Amino acid sequence: MGPGWRAPSAALVGGSVALFGALRRAALALPRPAAVRSRPGRVWRWRNLLVSFAHSVLAGLWALFSLWQSPELLSDIQDGYSVSGHLLVCFSSGYFIHDSLDIIFNQQSRSSWEYLVHHAMAISAFVSLIITGRFLVAAMLLLLVEVSNIFLTIRMLLKMSNVPSPALYEANKYVNLVMYFAFRLAPQVYLTWYFVRYVEVQGQGAFLMANLLLLDAMILMYFSRLLRSDFFPSLRKGSVGRDVDGEKFLID
């Protein structure tokens, strides 16, 4: 991918930011559960999660379809290229920029600082991919995580809305766990192994390796929280009486 792609890519990222801004405004008009309406602190989080859900559905299925359509890309993680994958990276870059701005402008930085760290890592990594045209397939593999995020976001929306159907939450709990292994942990483990074994640790390779290792630590931390919350609640510490208002990440 030559330099001629850079200006169109910037326009695509900007268009994605605008698209998610429009989705955010549309989410304001959607009906909200009584449990959300009665707690002002939850209104922003509910709307933010709806936009996040839209990104997860679109990006997760997009990544899955792109890799299914072109499986040969998996044999060239460093230099493989597809137009679909390039558009996907621009699309998700726009979402991460939009979500970061949404968090900051709505004064949620303190409660959602982990997302800001994650988004800064993702944006910087994706920009480097767009500029160099390398490791695009690695980004596509990482974006499979959005399939897992579909069910993780459903989990959080169910908790916030106090849905009176424990069976629905229980079913999603187990599906969420399976998806976490299949689309979050498995691609992450494979990419970490690949980078350690095959990628030269200098320049862009070193930068992406550092991002990947930090992401490994974050994913394991979130997995620990998920297990404690949904499967071993007796092991939770300091969560009694904790309010979820404004909290964007999985902490309860």
Curated annotation (Swiss-Prot):
One Pfam family in the UniProt entry: TRAM_LAG1_CLN8
Cleaved signal peptide residues: 1-29
Coiled coil regions, renumbered to chain: none
Residues that span the membrane, as ranges: 48-68, 85-105, 175-195, 203-223
Main location: membrane
Top-rank lineage group of the source organism: Eukaryota
Ranges for domain TLC: 41-235
GO biological process, one term: phospholipid homeostasis
Residues in compartment: Extracellular: 30-47, 106-124, 146-174, 224-252
Compartment list: Cell membrane
Database matches in PANTHER family: CT120 PROTEIN, TLC DOMAIN-CONTAINING PROTEIN 1
Function statement: Regulates the composition and fluidity of the plasma membrane. Inhibits the incorporation of membrane-fluidizing phospholipids containing omega-3 long-chain polyunsaturated fatty acids (LCPUFA) and thereby promotes membrane rigidity. Does not appear to have any effect on LCPUFA synthesis.
Record's protein name: TLC domain-containing protein 1
Organism from which the protein derives: Gallus gallus (Chicken)
